[in-house]
Amino acid sequence: MNTQTRETTSMSDAQDKAGTLIEALPWIQRFAGTTMVIKYGGNAMVNDELRRAFAEDVVFLHHVGIHPVVVHGGGPQINAMLSRLGIESEFKGGLRVTTPEAMDVVRMVLTGQVGRELVGLINSHGPYAVGMSGEDGGLLRAVRTGTVVDGEEVDLGLVGEVVGVNPEGIVDILAAGRIPVISTVAPEIADDGSTTGQVLNVNADTAAAAVASALGASKLVILTDVEGLYANWPDKSSLISSLTASELREMLPRLESGMIPKMAACLQAVDDGVERAHIVDGRLPHSMLLETFTTAGIGTQVVPDEETNA
């Protein structure tokens, strides 16, 4: 007779796990078959435990019938490479100033390092992820843009604003049962609609919003390094769990500069028909699952004006 030593779990622990699965069931049913666009960035990109947890979350979403689309930046990695090469980084209004020299580094890091590493992490669970950039298949189109700081126009160099998304490539990848992983560089478009031959650095938050809108996504989730949006930063008791598009539009000019692109992206997505947009703390392992599959959720959600409840 063979005997086996089995790892035992207390009945209460087992019941807790069962309760978690049951709580997730209505949310799995609600979002199965829909597309979820996730902007991957912040500390979740540089901490090994968080990187692995993020990849697991994406694969879990895939296996329960949700179609995840990952749009990533690479701020920490870009900063590290620019520093290594002796190229100074400058930010204005929360956006990177990109010189031609810096653009070469941005393109190299986003498409050749960050994207490939993320694809590899996801594919450690199976052959699911396919890497692409905004240049591939005419996915993204952008025009050069600046920003306004203290009421004055500021030139951001080779920084673009997405003005068009061709979602066919993403749709084809999803139809093949794969997970698109998109690097946010994009070809520049001239006034006549032709390409100029220049590649632009596109803010990943706003690019993710544009992709979510083009795909008719059920959710846009932006991972960041704070718990969510605060009504009175730095008072952490003022965390806002949910607000409408109109409420966010009124708050936007008063926000900290680093939060403006993220919250503007949420507002853009909801205004363009995405059902809801979320700011989620990427420093928390499995934060996407907590947001998507628990009744309380985490972080801050933005909903259309006609909807006030999650």
From Swiss-Prot:
Its main location: cytoplasm. The record marks K39, K262 as: Transition state stabilizer. It is an enzyme of class 2 (transferase). It is found in: Cytoplasm. Pathway: Amino-acid biosynthesis; L-arginine biosynthesis; N(2)-acetyl-L-ornithine from L-glutamate: step 2/4. Gene3D superfamilies: Acetylglutamate kinase-like (3.40.1160.10). Substrate binds at G74, G75, R96, N201. It catalyses: N-acetyl-L-glutamate + ATP = N-acetyl-L-glutamyl 5-phosphate + ADP. GO terms for molecular function: acetylglutamate kinase activity; ATP binding. Keywords: Amino-acid biosynthesis, Arginine biosynthesis, ATP-binding, Cytoplasm, Kinase, Nucleotide-binding, Transferase. InterPro entries: AceGlu_kinase-like_sf, AcgluKinase_fam, ArgB, Asp/Glu/Uridylate_kinase, Glu/AcGlu_kinase, NAGK-C. Its EC number is 2.7.2.8. The keyword Phosphoprotein does not apply. One of its GO terms (cellular component) is cytoplasm. One of its GO terms (biological process) is arginine biosynthetic process via ornithine. Belongs to the acetylglutamate kinase family. ArgB subfamily. HAMAP family: ArgB. Catalyzes the ATP-dependent phosphorylation of N-acetyl-L-glutamate. This is Acetylglutamate kinase. It comes from Arthrobacter sp. (strain FB24).
